[in-house]
């Protein structure tokens, strides 16, 4: 093998070693970006809820929950966001969405070994037909 062939092999080997490290670093940056975005969306959702804009709060909490999942955030945070999305959906009279988010919150709370009692109670209250426009 000549000098140029050895150099070519060495460069290929180096690229094979460096590429996974670069891809891992980019993945970590993407994860942190998703989690930061989730925190911002959660804050926006809180502001919307405080102004009584339940539909926007529901969308923002749901988007935050999606970003926590994409960013590999913990199950407890995802559960809390889904619970809040369920409450906001209930306030917006979107019972189908509320039920979905409460069920997601219950499943995620169990995965995180945290209590799912609040979401279970909210789901029961939803099924009991409490008045529309009142968050659970």
Residue positions per predicted region:
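Bacterial Sec signal peptide processing site at the extreme N-terminus
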Residues: 23-44
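Flexible helix-coil transition and linker loops at the boundaries of alpha-helical arrays
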Residues: 30, 67-75, 110-115
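Residue signature of alpha-solenoid helical repeat architecture, marking inter-repeat boundaries
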Residues: 35-36, 76, 117
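The tetratricopeptide repeat
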Residues: 40, 74, 81, 119-122
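Amphipathic alpha-helical segments of tetratricopeptide repeats
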Residues: 62-68, 104-108
């Amino acid at each position: 093998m000549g000098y140029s062939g050895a150099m070519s092999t060495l460069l290929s080997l180096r690229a094979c070693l460096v590429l996974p490290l670069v891809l891992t670093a980019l993945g970590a940056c993407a994860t942190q970006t998703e989690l930061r975005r989730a925190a911002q969306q959660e804050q926006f959702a809180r502001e919307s809820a405080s102004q009584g804009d339940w539909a926007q709060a529901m969308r923002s909490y749901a988007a935050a929950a999606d970003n926590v999942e994409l960013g590999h955030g913990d199950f407890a945070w995802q559960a809390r966001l889904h619970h809040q999305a369920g409450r906001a959906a209930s306030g917006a009279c979107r019972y189908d969405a509320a039920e979905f988010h409460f069920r997601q919150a219950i499943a995620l709370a169990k995965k995180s070994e945290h209590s799912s009692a609040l979401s279970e109670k909210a789901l029961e209250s939803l099924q009991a037909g409490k008045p529309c426009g009142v968050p659970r």
